[in-house]
Amino acid sequence: METVKELVQFMQPNQRLDLKAVALTHVLGLTGSSEGKSAILSLDEMLMAIFGLTFDANQTVAKDAVLSLINLTSEEEAAIKVFQLAKQLQPPFAIVEVAAKEITNEQSDLADPWSMVLSNLTRVESLVHEILDTLERDDHTLPRLAKAFAQLDYNKKKAKLHYLAPIFCNLTQVSRGRELCCHRKYELLEKLLPFASFEGSVVRRGGTIGILKNVCFDTVYHDVILNEQSSILVAILQPLCGPEEFSDEDNELLPIELQYLPESKTREEDPDLRKMLLECLLQLCSTRRSREILRSRGVYEILREYHKWEAKVGKDSDCLLACENVVDILIKKEEEIGLDNYKTEVEVPAEQSEKFVQEDAAYVKSLLD
């Protein structure tokens, strides 16, 4: 502890560059272990020094400071500690504003590490509303973040910005985040949709699919999702589609974007993501109107072929079961189902509902680790 405390004096903005760099390199190494993180988190003056060095004129020093924050915010309790201390300082260290500013700065060398810090902070559900307050303070911030995510060459210093996907996914943990994502004012969801099939990054793809699942769990948005002018259903189905040929009769049911797919078309390779997509469809089966729309758009036909592929190629039992859960509903006549709304007429035990949320949160976290 004393050794860590002694480093603080060398991490002041006006200190010699070589001393700052050596001290911060040591601190960054400490953040890689649970013991080191505990020691640093117990010293407010050390955290304050790290905050200050994120603004250092030397890019290597600034980057090491931000990388330290990534490690220090990787667990919920620690993330809360960092967030609260940053807020309590006089003047405050505006960690969310700084992150958003760096992410949306096309010339920033630190956009990727700052996006990972913000991803860690937004993962903590108890912080999401306060983070949204900050992001909404300026009407331009959310649209700029969406633009930075949607435009692959946005950052001129070659930052990938893949972690914006889990940031948006984390924000949609809460109803306010889902509302913002679906609101016409920002049209965030439409900008994010293409990346549900993005082959270049499982983090970007997984975060986008997580957004879709969070929105699908909220029946308020089912009409938006299933609107004929919306591309959301296509974004959910496309990763589940393969190169199989359909009869003309079946093809007429499918959305035009999913008709006559090329022989090179492949399905989502990650079984956890396939399962999340299938769970999206299961949630969309909650009302009679939604079920009828799904049937009319060839969802059963797509899942019929998908099930054959999963049984022979994918071979994931959880995905097979998730597919069968949807198919079992779609093949039934409404008279057999006898319910207009599964969610209001069939009560899901609270502990089971909580388990679903925890499992999904754990999976998204596994993508980031």
Swiss-Prot record:
Pfam families: DUF383, DUF384. InterPro entries: ARM-like, ARM-type_fold, Hgh1, Protein_HGH1_C, Protein_HGH1_N. PANTHER family: PROTEIN HGH1 HOMOLOG. Belongs to the HGH1 family. This is Protein HGH1 homolog. It comes from Drosophila melanogaster. The lineage of its organism: Eukaryota, Metazoa, Ecdysozoa, Arthropoda, Hexapoda.
